[in-house]
Structure formats: C-alpha cells, structure tokens
Amino acid sequence: MPKKAEAKTGSSSKTTKRTVAKKDVKAEVNETNKTAEKVSSKKVNKTANSVDTNESSSNSTPSTGSKFELSSFKEKVAEIENNILQKIKENPTITGKPFRKLVSVNKLMETGAHIGLTTRKWNPKMKKFIYTKKGNNHIIDLLHTVISLNVAYNFLLDLVKANSNSESSPVLIVGTRGKTIKNHVKEQAKRSHAFYINERWLGGTLTNFSTITKSVAKFNNLILIHKNGEINKYTKKEQVELKKKTEKYAKYFSGIRTMKELPKVIILTDPEINKIAIKEARNLGIPVIAICNTNANPDLVDYVIPANNHSIKSVYLLVGLLCDAVAEAKGLPKAFAEKKDEEILLPEVIKRKPENRRQNNHSFNKN
C-alpha cells in the first residue's frame, strides 16, 4: 500500500476510535437530542445524498454547470424535505412541542446552511450532527438543523413571554464576524427590541457587569452632552477628545445602552470566535443558543443549531428566524418565520475574483 494511503487509513482509524463526549444540559434538550439522533440514524435516501454532495462543491445553489438541471434539483430538495417532515411526523414529541415549519429545507439549502467546513477542521463532538462527507467538506444533517431551530425558537418564545413585565430585554445577540452580519445583527435586534453586541466582545461584559454598567453610564452621559448642546461650552480641543471618546464607547456599548440587568439568554452566530462570551455565560448559568459549524464544541452550548455559520446567507436567515421568536413573543410582526420562500429576501454576496486579490502584487514584478 502507498505511504499516502497508509497515512489516510491510519488517521481515519484514529478518528473512529474517538468517543463523542456527552454534555450536561437541561433535561428537555437532552431528550430532544437523543430522539433526534435515533431519527437521523436512518439515512434519508441515496437521491437525497446526491443532492447534498453536489451542493457542497458550489457552496450555494447549483450552477448551470451542475449535474442536475434546476427542475431536477428542486424535485430532489422536495424529496429531502418530505423525508425530514415524515420523520418528524413519526416522532411528534421530537421538538418538545407541536412542530412548526419555520422555514423550508429548500431555503436552508439555498443559503448553504448544510455545508460544513473542511474535514480536517472538524470537531469529533459534532459527529452526530453530520450527515455525510463529500470531497473535502462535511455535510450537516438538516434534520438536526430543523429540529434544533424549532427547540430554540420555542425556548425563546417562552422565555420572552415569561419576562414580559421586565424593564430590560432578556435576550442578548452577539455577532462579530463580517460587516454584513454585524449590520444584520444590529437591525434584527432593534426590530425585536433585543440587545446586541456586534463588535469585539469585551472581557467581563457579563462577569464584571457592574464595571460595564459604569462605562455605559458614561457613554449615555456623553450622548446627553451632545444632544443638549452642552458640548459647545468646551474648547475645540476638548470637543475633539469628547467626540473620540463617544465614538469609542459607541462602538462597544451602543447595543447595550439600556441593559440594566444581565440577560437571560445569549445568542451567538459563531461560538468559536466568542469563546469568552460562552465562558462568562456558563459561569453565570446563562443559557447559550449558538449556530454551530462542524468545528464547534457542542458541549459548551445549551441549544445547538447545526448549520454553516461561515455563509453570510445562512447566518442572515437563522438570526432573522431567532429574532422572529423574540418579536412574536412581544406581539411584533415576523420577517422570516413561516414565510414563503419568495418572501424571504437574502443579501447578495459578491465574491471577489482571484485577480482582484492580487492586484497590488504587481509592484514585485520585474520588468
């Protein structure tokens, strides 16, 4: 056997020997995950697998050069969706409450939610959420995504309703990756009257909340100085300094200006780049909902939503759905949940061409 083949078989045997660690979370989440595992252990269909694998290579909906024609692709997606819904129908208690079709499988696949990271980056603890492997990527089992999304949605719905008399919103949304996601987190949090952090997480935001509150009070005071014209009393040099200070505070505290108490839950778009936030939440017993890619550690998250969190469209859709739960609990209109596919508008993602990335390297060329 060639050396490369030996290396591959050796690494794969080591991987299969690893055991998936079990996490201690709430009883209802444990029960849901166990039931979901039993249901998903039955493979969907060979045809369903072929659609997933073709999808992974393009990282989006199939292009004109894909193996399936568009009509055929839609038929395959419909077949996958029917299989998933049938499995849920056979296990009505799988989501803890009556199942709600929040979004179609077709829309999830359109966003690339099922496409995991490359296999070398995976965390073995995410094995139960993975459907198969295609090429260099893992494919996420959308059955788990649909079920987990329902469980998280119901949890948020009940939590916000239970805290309806509170002056402060119980939900804090954290999304710090990429300009589009940062802006979307801000928009959706404002729409659902939730708190948000879309810049770097400051250590101690939760565990040292009293100090953070003092900084927020200073920020609110600076805003007041600008609004009532009191800033004109200062010299030009002092005005410039105050403006810089205000902008610095605004960057980190704009989304939590009115947060008077600790949140009851935090929602993360990427647990891997916000590990400090997870650690603080766990220390204080605050539940964590997170969109987990195949590289995440699900043991650190209370409500895992397995999906591609490196895809702008995928995160855009899932954040919108979770914020709809908060909005619904407050009697506000929904923007994503239970809408038709054509009613859900996703951002246009423009990929830079390789030549554009290297346009500044011409200075090294010799004439």
Swiss-Prot record:
Residues 1-68 are annotated as: Disordered. Keywords: Ribonucleoprotein, Ribosomal protein. GO terms for cellular component: cytosolic small ribosomal subunit. It comes from the Bacteria. GO terms for molecular function: structural constituent of ribosome. Residues 53-66 have a biased composition (Low complexity). GO terms for biological process: translation. Residues 21-40 have a biased composition (Basic and acidic residues). Pfam families: Ribosomal_S2. InterPro entries: Ribosomal_uS2, Ribosomal_uS2_bac/mit/plastid, Ribosomal_uS2_CS, Ribosomal_uS2_flav_dom_sf. HAMAP family: Ribosomal_uS2_B. Belongs to the universal ribosomal protein uS2 family. This is Small ribosomal subunit protein uS2. It comes from Malacoplasma penetrans (strain HF-2) (Mycoplasma penetrans). The gene is rpsB.
